[in-house]
Curated annotation (Swiss-Prot):
Transmembrane segments: none annotated. The gene is xseA. The keyword Repressor does not apply. GO terms for cellular component: cytoplasm; exodeoxyribonuclease VII complex. NCBIfam families: xseA. GO terms for biological process: DNA catabolic process. Belongs to the XseA family. HAMAP family: Exonuc_7_L. It comes from Geobacillus kaustophilus (strain HTA426). It is found in: Cytoplasm. GO terms for molecular function: exodeoxyribonuclease VII activity; nucleic acid binding. Its main location: cytoplasm. This is Exodeoxyribonuclease 7 large subunit. Heterooligomer composed of large and small subunits.
Amino acid sequence: MEVKYVTVGALTKYIKRKFDVDPHLRDLWVKGEISNFKQHSRGHMYFTLKDSQGRIAAVMFAGYNQHLPFRPEDGMNVLARGEISVYEPNGNYQLYVKEMQPEGVGSLYLAYEQLKQRLEAEGLFSPVHKKPLPAFPRCIGVVTSPTGAAVRDIMTTIRRRYPLAKVILFPALVQGDGAAPSIVRAIERANSFGGVDVLIVGRGGGSIEELWAFNEEIVARAIFASKIPIISAVGHETDFTIADFVADLRAPTPTAAAEMAAPHVGELAERLAERKWRLIRAMKEQLAADKEQLRRLQGSYAFRYPKRLYEQKEQQLDALLERLSRQRERLVDKHRQRLHELDMRLWRHHPAAELERMKERQKAAANALEKAMRTAVERHRFRFRSNLARLEALSPLRIMERGYSLVYNEQGELVKRTNQLRIGEHLSIQVQDGRVDCQVTGVEEKHV
């Protein structure tokens, strides 16, 4: 009997088709806790959803997760929407997630808190980075929608308070898709425009979704990177956006931002009037003090007898002139003596004098050399004679003059002992005036 079978691959494909055609598994929300979360280098997210009764593998591809407003983490309870299917290579079923949000907490709020903590840790909110606002700006830039109420409020407030300032609008989207990049581009244009002293970035009020562009990371980093001081004005009294934390100054409304950026001409006039009054009062007080001092000086001894002021100084001047004259004479004598010394040194170093001295030294050296040579010759002559006398005293010829002779054997060797001789051996005897040949007839050894 032939057994019917299916291959593993065919069975897996069959089960996968069952999952794929089941309407209950094509689009569903799954609640669970994230564990084993990993994000691939290509952006895909892999994790497990679990509860007390089970677990299921899940994947969220980069095309879906790039728009997530929060960062998934292990231990986070979420609601995940997607479809169930089978991953054929290992036969496991898993949830293919297309949408996800935190359970119990709005995803926007979670994203806000996560970004806030991260940027604060990087130091973007630190007071050390806050730039001061100019006291009297000549040009005020505004980044907002050109059609909203915020731009009208800002323009009206600045013209009313400080008409001396020029206002430049850098239009941008302030809500919806593309709002955050639009705000970033407007801030960058304001920085590259040149001449903008302070920048207001904001919009009128709205829901958190409408204001969300001001919570985007790219907007926060553009505000932080701005060289121009920025006032955030996102039209809400109580809540803060990320832009508020990064900006150099936060205003609760666009109107308040305009008031912070532009001083009031009336207030300036009052301050100028007050300073003018204070200056006049100070000048009057100083003038009165100077008059009183002049009155006291006019009644003083010096003003009554003015000659006494310079009589003593004249005497001191005479003494100083006398000291100066003596000092000048000493200085002239000193330089005269110095000139004489230099003249003597110059004479000593004159070429003729130097040549004469060199001739004297050469003559003295020649005499000394001649004397030394004579002494050396005499010394060597004496040594030669002494050595010659010693050599003559040691010469064999001198010895033979005293009766001695030299005896040589047949081999021509000098005979010094009797043991060198044999009977019948011929000898040669060298005397002072010649040689004698003889033969040994007997040898007698002398014992000492």
